[in-house]
Regions:
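Boundary/entry segment of secreted carbohydrate-active catalytic domains
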Residues: 1-6
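Generic hydrophobic alpha-helical segments
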Residues: 7, 35, 76, 148, ...
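Catalytic grooves of carbohydrate-active enzymes
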Residues: 145, 149-188
């Protein structure tokens, strides 16, 4: 989880804004709790909700009980002291922003997203994902910042984003555990 520390460092040193969607279950050690506190102290960072459990990576069962998803979100608010109403659902590119909505191709998150929206949560998906060069890579080498930048510009130019002239990029903190990949984040 050194990636969280590296992300926070880049937000501070480069004076850029970022929103981090946190999973409460992951904040169980002294170091991880400190990373959460460091994000809270950073004026460039916004903390948002990515559920307490991350569905324990059992998404079909998780989304089959919308009320359970809602309770998991509420638990994360308490555990991490999250005040934002922004949520990203685990493993689903689902959006609920005001009257606008977009559903993930895997439709099983729709009832949960609708319930959360009804309770004044704003659900964010993503427009673009920064992935590893190869999912099977042992080095976890990331796509180059230039390739990511080109993808961002293309999506904005072609209006291939959820909201015009606004892009949400999905990254995971473990991508930046090593300093080499953290430097790629800085370059972007």
């Amino acid at each position: 989880y050194k990636g969280s520390k590296n992300i926070n460092k880049v937000l501070t040193e480069e004076n850029v804004k970022g929103t981090v969607f946190l999973v409460g279950f992951n904040a169980f050690t002294k170091d991880l709790k400190q990373y959460v506190e460091d994000y809270k102290q950073n004026p460039n960072g916004e903390i948002a909700n990515h559920t307490y459990s991350h569905a324990h990576n059992k998404y079909k069962a998780f989304y089959s009980m919308p009320e359970g998803v809602y309770e998991d979100i509420r638990k994360n608010e308490v555990v991490l002291d999250i005040h934002s109403r922004w949520v990203r659902l685990p493993a689903r590119n689902t959006w609920r922003l005001g009257n606008k909505k977009k559903d993930d191709p895997v439709k099983n998150s729709i009832p949960a997203a609708d319930l959360l929206a009804k309770n004044q949560f704003f659900i964010y998906g993503w427009d673009y994902e920064w992935e590893r060069s190869s999912k099977k890579s042992k080095t976890h080498e990331l796509s180059s910042p230039q390739n990511i930048y080109n993808g961002i510009v293309y999506r904005l130019d072609q209006n291939k984003t959820y909201e015009k002239n606004h892009l949400v990029i999905l990254m995971h903190d473990d991508m930046f555990n090593d300093d080499h990949n953290a430097e790629k984040l800085r370059q972007l």
